[in-house]
Amino acid sequence: MTKEEAIEVDGVVKEALPNTTFRVQLQNGHEILAYLSGRMRKHYIRIVPGDSVKVALSPYDLSRGRIMFRER
C-alpha cells in the first residue's frame, strides 16, 4: 500500500485488542480493525480507547487499516 493509494480518514479508538490491534470507529460510522504503524511502535506511542487517530485504509480492503497518527 503506497502513500498515493491509501485513503486517509479520521476515527476514534473504541477498543484495544491483542498485538497492537484496535477497533476504530470512523467519522462516517463504520467500524474497522486497525493496527499500529511501525514508526509508532518504534517510538513507543501509546494508544488508549478514546484517542482520536488518523487511519490509512487500503482501497482493496476497507475493513482494515493502519493507524498513522494520534491526535493530541
UniProtKB/Swiss-Prot annotation:
One Pfam family it belongs to: eIF-1a
Q: Name one GO cellular component term.
A: cytosol
Keyword set includes rRNA-binding:
yes
What residue stretches are annotated with the S1-like domain? Answer: 1-72
Q: What InterPro entries does this protein's entry cite?
A: NA-bd_OB-fold (IPR012340), RNA-binding_domain_S1_IF1 (IPR006196), S1_domain (IPR003029), TIF_IF1 (IPR004368)
Q: Where in the cell is it found?
A: Cytoplasm
Q: Which GO terms describe its molecular function?
A: ribosome binding; rRNA binding; translation initiation factor activity
The keyword Secreted is annotated on this UniProt entry:
no
Per the record, the domain of life is: Bacteria
* Record's keyword terms, sorted: Cytoplasm, Initiation factor, Protein biosynthesis, RNA-binding, rRNA-binding
Give the record's subunit note.
Component of the 30S ribosomal translation pre-initiation complex which assembles on the 30S ribosome in the order IF-2 and IF-3, IF-1 and N-formylmethionyl-tRNA(fMet); mRNA recruitment can occur at any time during PIC assembly.
> What family does the Swiss-Prot or TrEMBL record give for this protein?
Belongs to the IF-1 family.
Q: What does it do?
A: One of the essential components for the initiation of protein synthesis. Stabilizes the binding of IF-2 and IF-3 on the 30S subunit to which N-formylmethionyl-tRNA(fMet) subsequently binds. Helps modulate mRNA selection, yielding the 30S pre-initiation complex (PIC). Upon addition of the 50S ribosomal subunit IF-1, IF-2 and IF-3 are released leaving the mature 70S translation initiation complex.
Put simply, this protein is called Translation initiation factor IF-1
Organism annotation: Treponema pallidum (strain Nichols)
Gene symbol of the encoding locus = infA
